[in-house]
Amino acid sequence: MAKTIVIKQIGSPIRRPEKQRQTLIGLGLNKMHKTRELEDTPAVRGMINKIPHMVQIIEEKG
């Protein structure tokens, strides 16, 4: 079974650069306090590291 990671959006995309908004959309987040469970891959980790002020890692599974 693959490792998964649960992330939560804690920052608003309002008044943020377009690249940061697109990164949120790429992670499947678009509303405040929404959570997603994603596969823990280098691509997902890289996207999270680009916007650490807007997302929070809730839990790492596996």
From Swiss-Prot:
GO BP terms, alphabetized: translation
A molecular function (GO) term: structural constituent of ribosome
Assembly description: Part of the 50S ribosomal subunit.
Protein name: Large ribosomal subunit protein uL30
Signal peptide: none
InterPro entries according to UniProt: Ribo_uL30_ferredoxin-like_sf, Ribosomal_uL30_bac-type, Ribosomal_uL30_ferredoxin-like
Family: Belongs to the universal ribosomal protein uL30 family.
SUPFAM superfamilies in UniProt: Ribosomal protein L30p/L7e
Keywords tagged on the record: Ribonucleoprotein, Ribosomal protein
Gene name of the encoded protein: rpmD
GO cellular component: cytosolic large ribosomal subunit
CDD domains per the UniProt record, alphabetical: Ribosomal_L30
